Amino acid sequence: YIILLYYVIKQKNRFKYLQLFLIILAVILSDFVTSSIMKPFFERLRPCHNNEINESINLVGVCRGMYGFASSHASTTFSLATIMHLFFKKNKIFIYLFVWSIIISYSRIYLGVHFPLDVLAGSGIGALVSLSIFESQKIYFKNNV
């Protein structure tokens, strides 16, 4: 994250601090939607807390939190990858953030703390939040600058 922060701050454009704010906002909002809205609303148990299947999964580590729909890890990583890609399309290095997001998301399934649908929904929420923020700022600046 420090490297990404450095990359944004070293940009030579007058909107770099606004971009940094919007990147942080996208990640926080993605986490809020999944953790504070979706998980309490759907109350879908994590695989490791589901008595019907928890004996058939290979739990690696500790199972925290009762509910897993949708994955906050997937949401925040895909949110970051999406908004970084949208802001810095010319720099192809940010494509690797999507690879990183996929690895993080897969790890949630592998560790037995999320179902595949939890991760898919989380990644979609993260990408959608970032796309919404990016498009909103484009509309705002088109009309006000």
Residue ranges of predicted features:
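Membrane-interface interhelical connector segments
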Residues: 42-61
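Transmembrane alpha-helix boundary/anchor motif
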Residues: 3, 32-37, 128-135
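Interfacial segments of alpha-helical transmembrane regions
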Residues: 5-34
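Hydrophobic residues in alpha-helical segments
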Residues: 9, 41-42, 109-110
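Transmembrane alpha-helix/helix-exit interface in multi-pass inner-membrane proteins
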Residues: 28-48
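Hydrophobic, aromatic-rich transmembrane alpha-helices
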Residues: 1-11, 77-85
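Generic beta-strand or strand-like secondary-structure segments
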Residues: 24, 36-37, 79, 83
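Membrane-embedded catalytic cores of phosphoryl/pyrophosphoryl-handling enzymes
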Residues: 57-145
